[in-house]
Amino acid sequence: MQFLKMGVWLLCLSATLQLHSQSPVKLKDQPIQLEGKIRFTLKVPDGYTIKAACEGLRRPRFFAKSPDGRLFVTDMYDRTDNKKGKIYILDGWNPVTKTFDNVITYMQNLHNPNQVAFYTMNGEHFIYVAETGKLTYYPYKAGDIAPSSPGKQIATFPDYGLSYKYGGWHLTRSLAFHNNKLYVSVGSSCDACVEKEEIRATIVEMDPDGKNQRFYARGLRNAVGL
């Protein structure tokens, strides 16, 4: 099973025929019909079909698999600087209908939530939530449908948004764990300017609890999805 994300829909691509890389890929048209009488046509390889696995999301960004095997997805609502973002759990995959039976709102009213990541410390699981102006982690337990206890904020970032006179671009914050370190990307405030904040256009390295923060890389316009 392979998953594709297109626009604001999650699409499921299932293979019924093995394709060989050395052979030319033959494409076929497949009509797609979504809720709200939305229709369009996609081209898919012969032997594949494509289907909407989940509908109704606004601006989905990144997936993360939880320790108990569920799929989390961030939704930034739209391209504006807003606090209407949500985190969804896509649960109950139905192999017959090729859809998720349950779409659960895990968190809402978030400030441009671009990405979440899971990490285990001392035998306990945590979910890290990256918003424009802050990074927070929450305890996570199997089967949670909302944070089980208050979160701990471990970092802050420039929060000027699109109204910032220097540009205010790059509202997203991306996360990655490696060798027990957490890496966070903070994009530049503009395409070409002298930055006001040192943290702009960098990747920041820190311990999973937020301690020992340092600049890991500089001069990166926007390392989204690092």
Task: Give residue spans per PLM region.
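Beta-propeller domains with acidic blade repeats across secreted/periplasmic ectodomains
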Residues: 22-226
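Bacterial Sec-dependent N-terminal signal peptides
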Residues: 1-23
